[in-house]
Amino acid sequence: MLKKTLLALAFTSLALAAFAQQTGIKRTPLQKLEFPDGYNTVTAIAEVPAGGAAGRHTHPGVETGYVLEGELNLLIDGQPEKTLKAGDSYQIPAGVVHDAKAHGDKAMKVLGVYIVDKTKPLASPAP
């Protein structure tokens, strides 16, 4: 019985650690438009602290971004890792698992535009 309890506690700790990593991103919505039909176009500032990560996640629509400050490692499933710096832009197709990690000792900040299915959340955690 003790073994099962310890195992359950270990799995719970891992799940909480994974959740904490996924909440490393702070999104500040700037504008939300109900356009085109059935979609929301959301413009937001996304920030990850130095040494932090957004956590693996997806969006129910395309994401286009522009790096405002800092550097980041962009990890998109099925693609080689990319290092982006202020002034660089990127695109991520709908439903593709990705993560962004602040590179170096500075926080990173991006301007993101998301065109997403309005019946779904802006972002969902991915395994």
Language-model-detected regions and their locations in the chain:
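Positively charged n-region of N-terminal signal peptides that target proteins for export
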Residues: 1-5, 10
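N-terminal signal peptide c-region/cleavage motif recognized by signal peptidases
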Residues: 15-18
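A short glycine-rich, His/Asp/Glu-containing loop-to-beta-strand
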Residues: 23-55, 113
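Short acidic-glycine-tyrosine-enriched beta hairpin
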Residues: 47-49, 72, 78-95
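Short, conserved beta-strand element in jelly-roll/cupin
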Residues: 47-48, 60-74
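Histidine-centered catalytic micro-motifs
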Residues: 55-61, 96
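Ligand-binding loop in jelly-roll beta-barrel domains
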Residues: 95-119
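Short, low-complexity, Pro/Ser/Thr/Gly-rich segments in the mature regions of secreted, periplasmic
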Residues: 119-127
